[in-house]
Amino acid sequence: MDHLPVRSITAMQDYIETHLHEPITLHQLAKVSGYSPYHAAHLFKQALGISPLTYWRKCRLSAAALELRDAQDPILSIALEYQFDSHECFTRAFASQFGLSPSTYRKLSPPIPIFRPFRYGPNRPQGVASMTKTTPIFIQLIQRPARACIVRRAKTATEYFQYCDEVGCDVWGVLGSVKEALGEPMGLWLPEAFRPQGTSKYVQGVEVPLDYQKPLPEGYELMKLPAQTFMVFQGEPYNDECFGDAIEALQTAIKAYDPAVVGYRKDPNGPCFQLEPRGERGYIEAIAVTKNKN
């Protein structure tokens, strides 16, 4: 799909995501894309697999769900804020997307498949050079106490794209909806001790307190993790269209780095993790380490 007009498609995405509280028409999207309403809608669906108005509805419902979870405003106020005409209209749309009513979700706040707007764009567009220059990397040590982790396993995946091929790309949205999460969702590479037979090395999960007891969606499980020291590597901010290069550059640096220079060594018994690649903060990945014995 590299032939599609990336800037026009992302301009429509940006417009939708910054106008969740306002009515949107195809004519408005056509104006920001530079194409006719028909052609703009066709390009959007060809690139992202759904129509722009469906994309807008999913974004509105997901934003409203997080507000239901975290705020105390009346359900009707939230419905009207996100351009639903009535409590009944909002309830029908909410139940259709998430499988439960807004009131039930507010009361129980179970994990639900929050829609995560994904940025359209090829990994390395034509005319964009690979990131070959040396860039600074920030390294820090962090301590994680014993905790649990809600995970969704695959069968054979060793990295993100294989994982999405096996289980789909909705897992991150479910993990991001967990109210009790101790941090943001992450991709994890698990050592054998954390992998039941026939399951993948790469999984996605989110850390929660050890006493987490809410029901889990089908296919998810609760995995306990012991206290662990991590060495976290963070690259410089990058253009989102170059996320593949940013990941490759940081992973190459991690392989070349020797933790012994600060008195540590890699811990093969601990998981490694990656956070969502976001250009404005740089790519972040961490390895498990343990302190060298004197």
Task: Walk through the language-model features, giving the residues of each.
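Sequence-specific DNA-binding recognition helix
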Residues: 25-44, 70-106
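Terminal helix-turn-helix DNA-binding modules in bacterial transcription factors
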Residues: 10, 14-27, 46-82, 108-129
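Short, charge-enriched, intrinsically disordered boundary segments that mark the beginning
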Residues: 1-10
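Short, Lys/Arg-enriched N-terminal segment that forms or immediately precedes the first helix
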Residues: 1, 42-48
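A solvent-exposed interaction/effector surface
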Residues: 69, 88, 92-294
